[in-house]
Amino acid sequence: MMNYRHILVMIDLSPDSYSLIHKASFISNLHNDAKISLIYVNTDYSDAYTGLIDVDIRNIQSYRLQDINNMLKNLKNYIYFPVHKVFIGNGDMTSCLLDVTQKYNIDLIIFGHYQDFWSKIVFSLRQIINSLHIDMLIVPFY
């Protein structure tokens, strides 16, 4: 059986992140209190949208950063174990995950996957699986 040393939990701004963190805590306890880190990857309009858009991207990013900070504050109240690191990535999800997993010796990543039509189009699970060479726990959300 693999002994995990550093678990990365990919969170979003939804309450579903709490269940991912709970799973990470459970797995960490089974593996001699493996370190747990969190990552949020911001893939907003400025990075993902290629067409014409008539909005002020800086305002969207500012609101999104405020949402992220609020989410992280709420998570601190929920989490009863030490969080090793918190990462906020921007842009391509696969690149951000690859960078963090290599630099910080992550050996397990936990993330959720929504089972709806749009998520199948937007979220490229295959690209992540083919790029990251570590164990993954994919938790389906319905």
Swiss-Prot record:
Keyword hit for Cytoplasm: yes
Family per record: Belongs to the universal stress protein A family.
Tell me which species this is from. Buchnera aphidicola subsp. Baizongia pistaciae (strain Bp)
Q: Which SUPFAM superfamilies match?
A: Adenine nucleotide alpha hydrolases-like
Its annotated function is as follows:
Required for resistance to DNA-damaging agents.
Q: Where is this protein localized, as stated in its record?
A: Cytoplasm
Q: What is this protein called?
A: Universal stress protein A
Q: Name one GO cellular component term.
A: cytoplasm
* Protein keywords: Cytoplasm
Q: Which InterPro entries does the UniProt record give?
A: Rossmann-like_a/b/a_fold, Universal_stress_UspA, UspA
Oligomer status and interactors: Homodimer.
Pfam families (UniProt xref): Usp
Q: Where does it mainly reside?
A: cytoplasm
